[in-house]
């Protein structure tokens, strides 16, 4: 009787072990099926309706306008005082995306913001907006151009309106502020008829200002390129553009350009920022067209550089 009970218990134990083994195999099979297969591409995935987007504020900046273009006026947009704060909000999970200016037709690379992108090693680029920029001189209602003694704007706004200022307000004091919209806000709140701001026409509505002069930018084809950033893994699926950072010595740059030519890759933009270790060593922020992820992988074999992939994305 005792022997029979012992045999029965041992049999049950074996059966239980077999059942656990089967369940484990099934679980592993499910996990394997859910993994991305080797060589599979990662697409850009954006839920515009539920997006929370951090941007350089206050309300009325061109960056806010770029947010509306990319996200089709869906989601919610949260203004921050600086681009660094806007990107940090993304990194800390307070927002799901951040939109930052990257380059302007007249002002060139927006250096501070390029540095911010380089410093945040976990972010990816999931989209781009090329926005036509029309600069305007805004002032309190009833103000005349002859009254203006001080002009506020972001340094890009100042650069873009420099020729007009030299011709029409040569004696005005020009003061740099954190954004074009911040300049408009200061004029509205300061209530000084001697002050004006270079900003978007939208700021006239937001801050109840008059447009004293429209379209004062130096170039009628003035545009700014904005990047849409995310904490998602960098997308590898084929798209209009691809961006990456190459880190290395300037002497090796011709070799990288030759490698791009061999891969039939079109260079869209290249910005260099010092590595701050040795003279001649740089971060190169590179955006290109006609470049698949496979082509990028070949480029990343170029000697003399280390690489950081930012993503494949389309342009709005």
Regions found by a protein language model. Name each.
Residues 14, 18-316:
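Domain-level signature for soluble enzymes in the chorismate/prephenate branch of the shikimate pathway
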Residues 1-10:
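N-terminal secretory signal peptides that target proteins for export/translocation
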